[in-house]
A protein has these predicted regions:
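Pepsin/retropepsin-fold aspartyl endopeptidases
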Residues: 2-343
Length: 343
């Protein structure tokens, strides 16, 4: 466990590569240029501990489902929440394995643990753990949770909103999850031990495509294809763009349209080059999705911390393709695609 905790990596390194790359101040450079005139500066955000803890909420008013409004901050989805009386926003981040809270607001809590976190460009700082009494949002309540405590000030500064922390599938994997980006809604539905809805009054979610979920962690991986080759993608609602591993087969990389390059600068002194472009040959099942934005970068550290080979990440552009239903108990992932005019 300690070794896995030392292999933490920042998903927000990838998230904010995308966000900053997309800023209007970026100079579009020809790919043949060997020196980019724009540097991407990364945060000190460490990846949360790789633990398999999950929590089940209490539903108020004896309800069997809840619809949670998702606010937008750029390409991030936010949930308004109250944590031990503190009101603010949680980033909906399915790439985070556990609950992560902002040290700005929870620094006075009793801390345990303390390991060195690793980012793409090297060690970037320690992570401590705290316990919180309760988290409330949209009529549901969680009690007695553990959370990693890190500095998330860079997200607040970048987006101009109060960020209490990050929340992912660990808080909802015992429920049926419906993510509707178009209508900015997250719906959670009570299910039994077999994954069936406890109340059938809600209409069943109809999918255009269904895929079996592999593994048993709080991180969701989706199988897709590029250039006819099967690839393993992390489904990440907080990734502001997609990502493809720079170690991918040449036949895969050749399908990408490279638009520009930027310099990736981490918390340390090391730098690396990141390419930004579009995916032209992505398929999930027999469904082709073209021209999604992506970055091309090394994902070896991400594979290490997840314990599985990670060929890419599917983020904001993928989420715009439809409505998603996830049932970890049944091990089912489904998509109902939006009509082309709706995307």
């Amino acid at each position: 466990m300690k070794q896995k905790r030392r292999k933490r990596i920042s998903l927000y390194i990838l998230v904010f590569i995308a966000g900053l790359t997309l800023c209007s101040s970026v100079n579009i450079l020809p790919v043949t240029n060997t020196h980019a005139g724009y540097s991407i500066f990364l945060s000190n955000y460490p990846f949360p501990s790789f633990q398999s803890i999950s929590y089940s909420p209490e539903f108020n008013l004896n309800s069997d489902s809840v619809v949670i409004p998702l606010k937008r901050a750029g390409r991030l989805f936010l949930i308004e929440a109250k944590i031990d009386g503190q009101i603010g926003n949680l980033v909906f981040d399915t790439g985070a394995n556990g609950l992560v809270l902002n040290s700005t607001y929870f620094r006075n809590y009793t801390k345990t643990g303390g390991t060195i976190s690793t980012g793409i460009t090297g060690n970037i700082g320690p992570v401590e753990q705290i316990a919180v009494r309760k988290i409330e949002f949209s009529g549901i309540l969680y009690k007695n949770l553990k959370a990693d405590l890190v500095n998330l000030g860079h997200i607040e500064n970048h987006r101009g909103v109060k960020i209490l922390g990050l929340i992912g599938f660990s808080m909802m994997r015992n429920l049926e999850i419906i993510i509707d980006p178009k209508n900015s809604e997250l719906k959670l539905i009570r299910i039994d031990k077999r994954g069936e809805r406890v109340n059938n009054t809600d209409s069943e979610f109809k999918t255009d495509f269904t895929q079996k979920i592999e593994g048993n962690t709080n991180i969701l991986f989706i199988r897709g294809k590029i250039a006819g080759k099967n690839l393993n993608f992390c489904f990440d609602t907080a990734a502001e763009t997609n990502a493809i591993s720079s170690d991918s087969n040449k036949s895969i990389l050749s399908t990408l349209t490279i638009m520009r390059r930027s310099i990736l600068k981490g918390a340390g002194t090391a730098r690396s080059e990141v390419l930004f472009g579009r995916m032209n040959d992505f398929k999930i099942g027999e469904n082709e999705i073209r021209e999604m934005e992506t970055i091309i970068t090394n994902l070896d550290a991400l594979s290490d911390v997840y314990g599985t080979k990670t060929d890419g990440m599917l983020g904001y552009n993928f989420l715009q393709q439809g409505t998603f239903c996830i049932n970890f108990v049944k091990k089912q992932f489904g998509i109902r695609f939006s009509k082309k005019e709706e995307i």
